[in-house]
């Protein structure tokens, strides 16, 4: 399968050329012998692997990793550092899932072809310092898998994203400094996040930082979910914080007014600032 920024993150394991996940639920521990089995697949371009430690990661990178365009590091809980990855000059996509020890990124300056990077469930990684060195990066996602809340999954700041060329940002965690509006100073064109972590005013203020062309889940002030009961489906619409849940078919008029108010808030926050500058004005909706 040919991977791209549009399909790599959600690719099922059966679409990888090689699957070296260990049978243990926690990712297990992979052996040198298992890593050496890669030599039997010289044409493989995509790999999912689990159970690496610092020494076996270094071995994998030194002997085999350079042949892959896409690597998914699945449950490598004993890794304490990712420095070996700086040698991967040809890798295009990297996905990480679950680690409790890694505290910083690696030197990404030599990852000259890296287009997509996803990091999920890393409980000690709270800084993305160094991401700005990867000039080819277009797709970045960080947080908890499936958006599940975890107080240990957070970043200190988004400021380094201003120095990147990232166009897609997926965010499913907490932000320590609370400065979401800095994202409006980035190259982001598509933003996915959970709108329910914001009040209506906060989300409108954030979206107003971007041009009308912004795409993604962030531009919708709600998520949806359905429950089946005795063959009957009830669709729930979950709005921003502080707003009562809507039920489709029952609260349609209230939901329509909610969307209209949100749209008005975004438009109001985009009006030119009084000082005549080109920046956005972040006054509350309704101010004169």
Predicted regions span which residues?
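Aromatic-rich beta-strand edge motifs centered on tyrosine
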Residues: 181-182
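Concave beta-strand-loop units of leucine-rich repeat
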Residues: 2-39, 43-56, 61-79, 90-103, ...
